[in-house]
Amino acid sequence: MASSDGDRLCRSNAVRRKTTPSYSGQYRTARRSVVVGPPDDSDDSLGYITTVGADSPSPVYADLYFEHKNTTPRVHQPNDSSGSEDDFEDIDEVVAAFREARLRHELVEDAVYENPLSVEKPSRSFTKNAAVKPKLEDSPKRAPPGAGAIASGRPISFSTAPKTATSSWCGPTPSYNKRVFCEAVRRVAAMQAQKAAEAAWNSNPPRNNAELDRLLTGAVIRITVHEGLNLIQAANEADLGEGASVSKRGHNRKTGDLQGGMGNEPMYAQVRKPKSRTDTQTTGRITNRSRARSASRTDTRK
């Protein structure tokens, strides 16, 4: 057993250790407080150990409390700003908690190593060279040559010069013109097929499924593919909805005159000539009106 001098020394040392007490109106209800005294010369060199109960005041300040009954007791509170409840009874619980946390960390590292995209925030080893590695999810796919011009809604046209190739995905001029040609054929074919279908329906509209089958069996839709710039002009007019209002006419390439075409003939793009300012009828009308106005003005003045 420890001597009485050793017990007294243990209490005095424990009191000296509490140098930062805080003022409070209640006693500290500690779950566990262990005060270990220094070893002495006796056989029992572990010192004096005591445990504080939950309902009794701290033994460290018991003497001070009974000496100063009329004053507010200065109770020590632990300097724990986090307010965590992670208290362990013995070292075995600490070791078990540490092993469990290390196991969870290893499992997360294994998952990140197998599939880096499976977690939102990978470890620092994977984000170290994130700026060098290309993005797999956020990088959009580049459109093929000609797709952007077709999807923009602007009039399509053939390209006579290759694009400035800034990356490997940019194709040459033939790829661009091929896509423009296919789009022009699609627009013209759709316009001609719609007109042929409307004509077949209006000639003998079906009233049941049997008549509809006969109409589809007997209907022949003839699609003519134009050549050169006429194809692009017809495709642009079909895209703008102007192809339906233009009358069916053919273009004689030898003479350049406009001739009336048959129903089965292809419809070419028409270029309307603007009226000349030297038109005799227009100038005659203007002169007659001006003369009439000038004559009326002179009559009123007289």
Swiss-Prot record:
Task: Give the record's GO CC terms.
Answer: host cell Golgi apparatus; host cell nucleus; viral tegument
Quaternary structure note: Interacts with gE (via C-terminus); this interaction is necessary for the recruitment of VP22/ORF9 to the Golgi and its packaging into virions. Interacts with gM (via C-terminus). Interacts with VP16/ORF10; this interaction allows the formation of a tripartite complex composed of VP16/ORF10, VP22/ORF9 and VHS/ORF17. Interacts with the capsid-binding protein ORF44. Interacts with host CGAS.
Q: How is it modified after translation?
A: Highly phosphorylated in the host cell. Packaging is selective for underphosphorylated forms.
Q: Where in the cell is it found?
A: Virion tegument; Host cytoplasm; Host nucleus; Host Golgi apparatus
Q: Where in this protein does the record put region Disordered?
A: 1-42, 125-170, 243-302
The residue ranges flagged as biased composition, category Polar residues, are: 157-170
Q: What is the lineage of its organism?
A: Viruses, Duplodnaviria, Heunggongvirae, Peploviricota, Herviviricetes
Is Phosphoprotein tagged as a keyword?
Answer: yes
Q: Which UniProt keywords apply?
A: Host cytoplasm, Host Golgi apparatus, Host nucleus, Phosphoprotein, Virion, Virion tegument
| Known role | Tegument protein that plays different roles during the time course of infection. Participates in both the accumulation of viral mRNAs and viral protein translation at late time of infection. Modulates the RNase activity of the virion host shutoff protein ORF17 probably to ensure necessary levels of key cellular mRNAs and proteins. Plays a role in microtubule reorganization that occurs after viral infection by stabilizing microtubule network.
Q: Which family does it belong to?
A: Belongs to the alphaherpesvirinae VP22 tegument protein family.
Q: Where are the transmembrane segments?
A: none
Q: Which parts of the sequence are annotated with region: Interaction with gE?
A: 154-244
Signal sequence range: none
**Where is the short sequence motif Nuclear export signal located?**
212-224
Quote the protein name from its UniProt record.
Tegument protein VP22
Biased composition, class Basic and acidic residues, residue ranges: 1-10
Does this entry carry the keyword Phosphoprotein?
yes
